[in-house]
Amino acid sequence: MTRFFISPDQIKDRTVILRGGDRHHLLNVLRQGPGDEITVLNGKGEEYLVRITEVTTDQVYGEIIKKMERQAEPRVKLTLVQSLPKADKFEWILQKNTELGVSRFQPVLTERSNVKLDKSTQERKLERWHKIIREAAEQSGRQIVPVLEPVRSWSEMLAGCDTGLVLIPWEGEIVQSLKQVLERQPKIPELITVLIGPEGGFSLKEVVEAKEKGAVSLTLGPRILRTETAGLVAASALLYHFGDLGEN
């Protein structure tokens, strides 16, 4: 069934209103109209079955039939801090990790990042990245749209990275695996942050700075993973470990 994320202010009592791009997509792409049923989400985890009742020149109205009782969000909140790679790679990272269950994305510029963004370019990129995340969330059955933070420097990111379990996969770590780190956790962390380096990896200085802030370095295995693969592997392993992708 077709799914739409809308703002909570577009839900009034039992009436739902679709506007703009959602209206266009519903009518002109999906060819749906009065009598058809869709799924609407308010971005706060609430999901509704809605029947379309009326179409006007600028809005589509629907009636809430029932609130859906379904849990599609991981119990662990997972933040992916991704050193910015080239545009197409980052778009893939956003799409696939949204499908998987990541809750928040923090793009970051590191010493070996080969991406330069001025203010106007970043604004355009953020708009496109938001769109990719939203579409991936709709397609994959998410009940929230993951948060996308603005691009930050390494130092800015570390300053706000002081809660929960912080992990930094690093090719220089040969002793401690992700499994070993997780087995030492006394309880399920409410928040896990994973720091992923660029194509050339983190500098030693960055790893030291992260560990000084409490990050735990670890290895993801004997093979070196691409930047777009590393985050997906780490997120998959974490969500599986905590029971989101199957029984432990």
Question: Which sequence ranges carry the predicted segments?
Answer:
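N-terminal positively charged helical leader segments and presequences
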Residues: M1-E69, S120
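A generic structural signal for short beta-strands and their flanking turns/coil linkers
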Residues: T2, K12-R14, P34-D36, E46-Y48, ...
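Short, glycine- and charge-enriched coil/turn segments that flank and shape catalytic ligand pockets
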Residues: D9-T15, V55-Q59, E69-A72, K119-S120, ...
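Glycine/charged-rich beta-loop-alpha catalytic/anionic-binding loops adjacent to active sites
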Residues: V16-L18, R75-T79, E190-T193, E212-L220
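Residue-level signal for inorganic ion chemistry
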Residues: G35, N97, I133, A210, ...
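RNA substrate-binding interface of SAM-dependent RNA methyltransferases
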Residues: I65, Q71-L167
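Active-site/ligand-binding-proximal alpha/beta "capping" segment
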Residues: G164-G201, K205-E206, A215-T219
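Structured adenosyl-cofactor binding patch, chiefly the S-adenosyl-L-methionine
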Residues: L204-N248
